[in-house]
Amino acid sequence: MQQTAITANPDGTISTPEATGAMATYREVGPQLWRKVGGTQTLALTEADGVKTVIDSENPVSVLQEGPLARSAALNLGVLVFSAATLLCALLAWPLGALLRRADRATSGAGPGLRKLRTLQRAAVVVDVLYLGAWFVLIKPLLNTDVGVYRTSIDWVVGLLEVSGLLAVGAAAAGVWVAWRMARTDATRLTRAWAVLVALALLGVVWVGVVGRLMTWNLNY
């Protein structure tokens, strides 16, 4: 989800974040060549196999390449945040709603068909929340640059999570089907709209899994 963004400034310079988090400014000193203001570090823009590639003079062993929209960090992080927030809200809303109805001694008023759809929707949400939670626990050490925990002894865990992506796909399919069925019931507009949001959140989890290569069939991590 992390990417290096190079920004073009109005005065013709470009800016890029440094390892410290500060922004460094570069001024063009030649064709497709920029030098750091007040320094000697340079960035050179070339093309490799038709892809725009930036070479850093202080890190020549790695390059920066223009990523497609599907791999945009801003897009995918937005999808992840939307999906996680929506699913957590859905997960918390159901017990809270039940408690409020119990306090008011009221019933949901939903028919058997609508209750079955809600049950299926809840099951799909639980599956995806567990799926995201498991991946977060596994990836958390990497976010802290603690790569020592990734050994062959956890290969089975990684493989299990990769295969569990099929459950996330099934949950998304169930969520879309529930939203489609909800639209053809006497449920309130709010309920139907919420079903669509939940379906989009479930699809968002699949999107993140596919783009992030969490749903794969190998142990190259």
Predicted segments — roles?
Residues 1-221:
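Peripheral terminal and inter-domain segments
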